């Protein structure tokens, strides 16, 4: 049994919706897996300590920024910084396959900017992106990437 871990934070419910639908899709399409959702907001809210991951994971990161335009005059990450703290904890960065970014395309250059910044900061790739809650095609696309990373076998 392979454990697929999805580390994320959801503030407006969009990322939670995507990760939940992704989990359901993965379980319906691939055999011999279990999917673990690790919601960083819950760890923080419950006062639990961060811990080292003992197996690989994929991170999901929405974009919450203030100030600047993300290109010419900077920006400041807000609300999602606990994900960065979790990834930076112990050897967690080395266990991260990569990050899936989300956001709103109306923000132009700031769309998925936090995911791009984490990619540079921690040295792992941006695996994919989706807008708002994501569409079924986004779920299928990210599931295919995860299947390749974890070397999963299709159910049928």
Swiss-Prot record:
Record-linked InterPro entries: Flavoprotein-like_sf (IPR029039), RNR_NrdI (IPR004465)
Domain of life where this protein originates: Bacteria
UniProt cross-references to Pfam families, sorted A to Z: Flavodoxin_NdrI
GO biological process: protein modification process
GO molecular function: FMN binding
SUPFAM superfamilies the UniProt entry points to: Flavoproteins (SSF52218)
Recorded family membership: Belongs to the NrdI family.
Protein name as it appears in the record: Putative NrdI-like protein
């Amino acid at each position: 049994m392979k454990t697929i871990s999805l580390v994320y934070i959801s503030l407006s419910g969009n990322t939670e919706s995507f990760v939940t639908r992704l989990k359901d899709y993965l379980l319906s399409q691939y055999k011999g897996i279990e999917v673990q959702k690790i919601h960083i907001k819950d760890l923080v809210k419950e006062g639990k300590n961060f811990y080292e991951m003992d197996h690989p994971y994929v991170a999901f990161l929405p974009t919450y920024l203030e100030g600047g335009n993300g290109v010419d005059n900077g920006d400041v990450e807000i609300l999602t910084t606990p994900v960065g703290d979790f990834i930076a904890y112990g050897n967690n960065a080395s266990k991260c396959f990569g990050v899936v970014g989300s956001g709103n395309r109306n923000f132009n250059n700031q769309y998925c900017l936090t995911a791009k910044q984490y990619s540079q900061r921690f040295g792992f790739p941006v695996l994919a992106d989706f807008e708002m809650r994501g569409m079924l095609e986004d779920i299928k696309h990210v599931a295919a990437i995860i299947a390749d990373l974890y070397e999963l076998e299709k159910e049928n």
